[in-house]
């Protein structure tokens, strides 16, 4: 087969990308089809399975197997590029230990909590699962059942799960693993703008004059977006890049303003910037007067620890951490005035000239600024605050909702936005930014879902961290985990996670494609379909919703999470899960199953199977007899249409490479809240932050407060955890790709060479990382891509053989309830 010049150049670029990760690209590994069988390949579009960037790929299938993938040149997000993980997508589904049958712990032919895993049929698996869930519901009621889901759920999987729990079981104890990554971003948006998700889009990369990275290593975690920043920086010499972190990483290679700061002091630096803007008369007074109001948040809000923890007992406002009161601009100016260069430099360890350079980027009215952040902001005991505070500096200067002026929260999972946030799979949320605590929102959800009034419970359910605590305490007893690996991902796993899974009173179900740490801790493992083994939809960080068709069948008896949810719902009649007075309000539901009420309700089942594309298989449509995905999507979309969350009709997404909502009259929206761009902004207003009743954004006065745990004589190091380029999250997919595994096979303890020398350690020496909660064994690394300052160590968490979350602290932001994985105190002990 001839290779065109374009393909040759593209493959050279692939090889260069791979070489950065130290990956040899042999004939097999190159993922580039060059044989004569190429004409037998069927290529189709799909979004990448990994991060929240939402890159488009084209997928080649032959003989019911994915054999190649490549970047989709028609996708606006990545324009044909992929990162090194994306180039190996074709291999993630074919690990040697792929789960293909349900596995139940058994002894002497029966379920036993202490038994060994044995293969069973789906009927046997659901029989035991049904027995356990009904037992718990009968004995303790709906507050004792729960689910932990995912920002990797497809849109309809998350929607079906939310309906099953919030409407079917009448339990709000459903939360996604996006609680660990995006909850603070959600609260930041909701508190400031009254609506979730960014007002800008990826087009801002080509329009900005300055980029400020707050706690984000985009070079490794969002490499395709990083190429757009790099292109802008190198092609427009006046462009500036500031990178702020607690340790040096690859993104610093492009930094004009590199800043290493003491953990937690980003709060103080943001107040310094606000103060600098005010003191130097750089406030955009017209914008501020027309479009903002000021509030002061309560302080001393605690750290989301157990109620008997001394820090929680001392927290005066732990019960209402999100409260605030109105203030004036003058009050705000006085509040931030103490955050001058001298104070903040001493607190943060950042030289005053660096602080000034940073502040000048925001203050200069002629510089368009894009602020970008991920886990450094969000995984923070004041994560909601720090999100609010970055909006403060954009609002004070009016640098918002216009091309190149964009405070932009980057997303870590492929559908943390599209599913966890937009669908509302959090324990307190409903679709389209509605919440269970609002009676009007509950009423609207009950109307759309055809439920009797009072079905949806007002009280929010257990969030992610609280779920583990309630499992341990025996208050949450029937528990289903889908598309996540929380026994590796949760903080303080030995004290707060594992005990709950092994609690004899609890029955734990894990749906996964591989035998993860979490799956092996469960009582029942259900084999799940992956990625293009099912029809799906994701929503990325720029509000872009993307669809794909099922391209291959799942192996063996593996089934999609959607099928599992819907099939399991057939096991429950409404009388078994709803009180008699609720059933009496809808007597026609008596004797019906939850499947009938939730999924065969005249809406979800309204689209016949003949509407499924004849070019593709659809396992769920075949199983249930109607176009399941279309019915679920259209019912879900009805929540947001006409309310600023408009989605296009289902079929259009299969034709497009994604659309950014709100989609009104067939047109997507690039910049929200701006007249002329957002159809919801009234003419003559200029800007309208219509998520809030007054149409104004909130500027919050919030202080610096210390972290719950800092280094001391016994535990002298800060610990930060995170990711690396080659692996994604817990590594359950990427570590099964041989090339990615070889590139970075095991986690290490990155530390400063002088710290290692002072302790008599050298590179490669085996050590233990020890905290007040646990210990983990690894090896020292004093070279390479990550360079911590003295007094801090960085450990990636992708390695199932090195569970760094044995060590971390399960403290959270009390407002968002998101865990802080970036700072706790540890010591390093030579083995």
UniProtKB/Swiss-Prot annotation:
Residues 1-29 form the signal peptide. The keyword Glycoprotein does not apply. The keyword GTP-binding does not apply. [4Fe-4S] cluster binds at residues 48, 51, 55, 83. GO terms for biological process: cellular respiration; Mo-molybdopterin cofactor biosynthetic process; nitrate assimilation. Keywords: 4Fe-4S, Electron transport, Iron, Iron-sulfur, Metal-binding, Molybdenum, Nitrate assimilation, Oxidoreductase, Periplasm, Signal, Transport. Its EC number is 1.9.6.1. It is an enzyme of class 1 (oxidoreductase). PROSITE patterns: 4FE4S_MOW_BIS_MGD, MOLYBDOPTERIN_PROK_1, TAT. Binds 1 [4Fe-4S] cluster. Binds 1 molybdenum-bis(molybdopterin guanine dinucleotide) (Mo-bis-MGD) cofactor per subunit. Catalytic subunit of the periplasmic nitrate reductase complex NapAB. Receives electrons from NapB and catalyzes the reduction of nitrate to nitrite. This is Periplasmic nitrate reductase. It comes from Cupriavidus pinatubonensis (strain JMP 134 / LMG 1197). The gene is napA.
């Amino acid at each position: 087969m001839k290779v065109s010049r374009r393909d040759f150049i593209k493959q050279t670029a692939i090889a260069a990308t791979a070489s950065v990760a130290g990956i040899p690209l042999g004939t097999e590994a190159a993922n580039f089809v060059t044989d004569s069988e190429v004409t037998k390949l069927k290529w189709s579009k799909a979004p990448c399975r990994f991060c929240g960037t939402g890159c488009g790929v084209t997928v080649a299938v032959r003989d019911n197997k994915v054999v190649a993938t490549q970047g989709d040149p028609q996708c606006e997000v990545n324009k044909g590029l992929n990162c090194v993980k994306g180039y190996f997508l074709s291999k993630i589904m074919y690990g040697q230990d792929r789960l293909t049958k349900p596995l139940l712990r058994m002894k002497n032919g029966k379920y036993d909590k202490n038994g060994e895993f044995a293969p069973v049929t789906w009927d046997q698996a659901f029989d035991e699962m049904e027995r356990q869930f009904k037992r718990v519901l009968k004995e303790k009621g709906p507050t004792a059942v729960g689910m932990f889901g995912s920002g990797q759920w497809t849109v309809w999987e998350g929607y079906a799960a939310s309906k099953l729990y919030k409407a079917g079981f009448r339990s709000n104890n459903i939360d996604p693993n996006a609680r660990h990554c995006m909850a603070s971003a959600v609260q930041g948006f909701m508190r400031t703008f009254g609506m979730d998700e960014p007002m800008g889009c990826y087009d801002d990369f080509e329009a900005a004059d300055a980029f400020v990275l707050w706690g984000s290593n985009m070079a490794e975690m969002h490499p395709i977006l990083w190429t757009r920043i790099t292109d802008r920086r190198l092609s427009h010499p006046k462009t500036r890049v500031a990178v702020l972190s607690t340790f040096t990483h690859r993104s610093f290679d492009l930094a004009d303003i590199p800043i290493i700061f003491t953990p937690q002091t980003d709060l103080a630096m943001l107040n310094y910037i606000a103060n600098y803007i005010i003191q130097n008369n750089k406030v955009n007074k017209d914008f501020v007067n027309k479009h903002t109001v000021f509030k002061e948040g309560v302080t001393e809000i605690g750290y989301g620890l157990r109620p008997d923890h001394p820090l929680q007992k001392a927290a005066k406002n732990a019960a209402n951490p999100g409260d605030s009161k109105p203030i004036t601009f003058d009050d705000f100016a006085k509040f931030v005035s103490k955050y001058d260069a001298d104070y903040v430099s001493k607190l943060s360890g950042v030289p005053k000239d660096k602080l000034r350079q940073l502040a000048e980027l925001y203050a200069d009215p002629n510089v368009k600024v894009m602020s970008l952040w991920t886990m450094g902001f969000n995984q923070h005991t004041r994560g909601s605050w720090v999100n609010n505070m970055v909006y403060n500096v954009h609002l004070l200067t009016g640098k918002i909702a216009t091309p190149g002026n964009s405070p932009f929260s980057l997303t870590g999972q492929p559908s943390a936005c599209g599913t966890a946030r937009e669908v509302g799979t959090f324990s307190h949320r409903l679709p389209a930014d509605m919440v269970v605590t609002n009676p009007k929102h509950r009423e609207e959800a009950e109307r759309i879902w055809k439920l009797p009034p009072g079905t949806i419970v007002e009280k929010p359910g257990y969030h992610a961290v609280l779920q583990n605590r309630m499992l341990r305490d025996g208050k949450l007893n029937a528990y289903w985990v889908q598309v996540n690996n929380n026994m590796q991902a949760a903080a303080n796993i030995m004290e707060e996670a594992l005990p709950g899974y092994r609690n004899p009173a609890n029955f734990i179900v894990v749906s996964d494609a591989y035998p993860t740490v979490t799956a092996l801790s469960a009582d029942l493992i259900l084999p799940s379909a992956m990625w293009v083994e099912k029809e799906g939809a994701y929503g990325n960080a720029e509000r872009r919703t993307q669809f794909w068709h099922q391209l291959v069948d799942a192996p063996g008896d593996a089934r999609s999470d959607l099928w599992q949810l819907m099939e399991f719902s057939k096991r429950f009649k409404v009388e078994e899960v709803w009180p008699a007075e609720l059933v009496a309000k809808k007597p026609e539901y008596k004797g019906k199953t939850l499947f009938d009420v939730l999924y065969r309700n005249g809406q979800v089942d309204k689209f016949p199977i003949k509407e499924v594309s004849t070019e593709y298989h659809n396992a769920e449509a075949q199983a249930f007899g109607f176009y399941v995905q279309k019915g679920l999507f259209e019912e879900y979309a009805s929540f947001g249409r006409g309310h600023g969350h408009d989605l296009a009709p289902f079929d259009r997404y299969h034709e497009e490479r994604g659309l950014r909502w709100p989609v009104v009259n067939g047109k997507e929206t690039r910049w929200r809240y701006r007249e002329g761009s957002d159809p919801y902004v009234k003419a003559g207003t200029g800007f309208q932050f219509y998520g809030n009743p007054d149409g104004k954004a909130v500027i919050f006065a919030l202080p610096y407060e210390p972290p719950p745990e800092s280094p001391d004589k016994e535990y002298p190091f800060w610990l930060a955890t995170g990711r690396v380029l080659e692996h994604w999250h817990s590594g359950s997919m990427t570590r099964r790709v041989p090339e990615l595994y070889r590139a970075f096979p095991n986690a290490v303890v990155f530390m400063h060479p002088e710290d290692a020398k002072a302790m008599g350690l050298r590179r490669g020496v085996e050590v233990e990382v020890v905290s007040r909660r646990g210990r983990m064994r690894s090896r020292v690394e004093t070279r390479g891509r990550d360079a911590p300052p003295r007094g801090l160590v960085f450990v990636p968490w992708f390695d199932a053989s090195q569970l760094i979350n044995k060590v971390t602290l399960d403290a959270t932001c009390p407002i968002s309830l998101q865990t802080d994985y970036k700072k706790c105190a540890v010591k390093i002990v030579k083995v």
